[in-house]
Amino acid sequence: MERKAIIEFKDFTAHYTVQSKPTLNNINLTIYEGEKVLIAGPSGSGKSTLANCINGLIPFSTDIEISGSLKIKGKETKDLSVFEISKMVGTVLQDPDSQFIGLTVAEDIAFKLENNCVSQEEMKKKVNYVSKIVDIENRLDLAPYSLSGGQKQRVTLAGTIVDDVDILLFDEPLASLDPAAGKASIELIDKIQKEEKKTVIIIEHRLEEVLNCDVDRIILMNEGEIIADTNPNEILASNKLKECGIREPLYITALKYSGYELNKEMNLENIDKLKLSDDGEKLKTWYKSLNFNKKEREEDTLLEFKNVSFSYDKKKDILSDINFKINRGDIVSVVGKNGAGKSTISKIICGFFKESKGDILFEGKSLDGKTIKERGEEIGVVLQNPNQMISKTMIFDEVALGLRVRGIDEKEVKERVIETLKTCGLYPYRNWPVSALSFGQKKRVTIASILVLNPKVIILDEPTAGQDYKHYNEIMEFLLKLNKKGVTIILITHDMHLMLEYTDKAIVISNGRKIADTTSAEILTDKEVIEKASLKETSLYDLALKFKLEDPKDFVCKFIDFDRGARN
């Protein structure tokens, strides 16, 4: 049966008028009806611009010059209005909150239908139908903002498919979801694509998670061009992911370390179907050759929670009887599903919230009675979105702000800011406006503005969210450098790769309670903890189980230790 093209780019170029080079350069691409396609590439590769050309935001809402041809369902998009394109292409944005319009879930899903003057009876039928597809039918009367991250995404998806569009475009659907919600999201997208016969395009950095369900093709982009367009097995067998600065699945890295020559016949995209000609003997031999010297550290407790509970209304505890210790010089992850209480812990440490029971000790002394300002002299917090922290126009002034507010002499301010900018790799940009920086560079500015105050602890909320692998590594290697200088680092994260690769210890929160406090490898190989906290087993553990390695937990620990050494 002949495939029918639904999206066709021919010699397509897009050039923002403020930039010297085209963002998309001579793109030739055909996507067929019913396909599921993953578009991946580093930041600035042009994938978002490509997506915005498909959904009509370009050229209608942007000052950009385009040439060549783009057809959707056989129609030239430059001859269509945004409204006409929106009847064919539905977009689910990275941030669901930015898409909500209705006061209830039902109202939000019905928004498109109201615009199309659909009768109330027909509207109710359609809303009920799509709400069942996305498993949100029991929450139609709730406010969208009261839902969890995964539920919010289901609402935006329902509002997109209610109009029966043929093409669904997902912009980083996993960015704000915990691992279990992310897995459920990918499974839901797969279900809709198959059952509703939709064409699905996913833009995402987190390749391994997307490949939990089959995709037909992966399109790799770099510097405005398509550098690969083929099936997942061929991509994974090549080195194109690393060449593009995209993180390959950890089990693929393990196979390469073991000495396997990868090829598409090995069914690399799925561990369950993975075939190794020697039944894993090379993997077993490599595992036996690994040494793991656990670093023993002297216990020097810096921060301690003692029976801490917290409640907004003195009725229901958000946190219940939390106990843990963090040693000086640690890098620690705090993990758990959305709404578990992770961010509440950081807010209590900083004094934004007051614990209702228990005590928090810092260097052996209670923080009770310490003001936010006093705590801020020892403990710094970096928010997920740097734009929420930045208040000055120029980089130097932003980093200097905290010192100037404290009345530090201007000569000392200059010395400390320059030293910090050099440490953060920002000195060449010291006289630049903050607006000229990339998202990752802005993140470093916010870290610098905290670091200049010489804190003993830095708490970072989702430090790598939305970052491609190159910028992810830059931020994490930078944090490791700070850690080596004695700064204790606490990471609140959903990223299981980050937890495994960079933190020796993790604290797991579930429904307001601490359920684990041990090594990252121990946590991500413990089925009970994983299920309770909506985490996800590492693919390394699955690989070890499939090929019957002697001790799967030990394999994960040794791989992480070896990989750190290889990367450094």
UniProtKB/Swiss-Prot annotation:
Protein's name according to its UniProt entry: Putative ABC transporter ATP-binding protein CPE1583
Binding site for ATP 1: 41-48
Summary of the function given for this chain in its UniProt record: Probably part of an ABC transporter complex. Responsible for energy coupling to the transport system.
Domain of life: Bacteria
Species of the source: Clostridium perfringens (strain 13 / Type A)
Mode of membrane association: Peripheral membrane protein
PANTHER family: ABC TRANSPORTER ATP-BINDING PROTEIN BC_2655-RELATED, HEAVY METAL TRANSPORTER
Entry's localization field: Cell membrane
ABC transporter domain ranges (all copies): 7-248, 303-536
Keywords attached to this entry: ATP-binding, Cell membrane, Membrane, Nucleotide-binding, Repeat, Translocase, Transport
GO molecular function, one term: ATP hydrolysis activity
EC number: 7.-.-.-
Claim: Translocase is one of the keywords in the record: yes
Family membership noted in the UniProt record: Belongs to the ABC transporter superfamily.
Residues reported to bind ATP 2: 336-343
Record carries keyword Secreted: no
InterPro entries, per database record: AAA+_ATPase, ABC_Co_transporter, ABC_transporter-like_ATP-bd, ABC_transporter-like_CS, ABC_transpr_CbiO/EcfA_su, ECF_ABC_transporter_ATP-bd, P-loop_NTPase
GO CC field: ATP-binding cassette (ABC) transporter complex
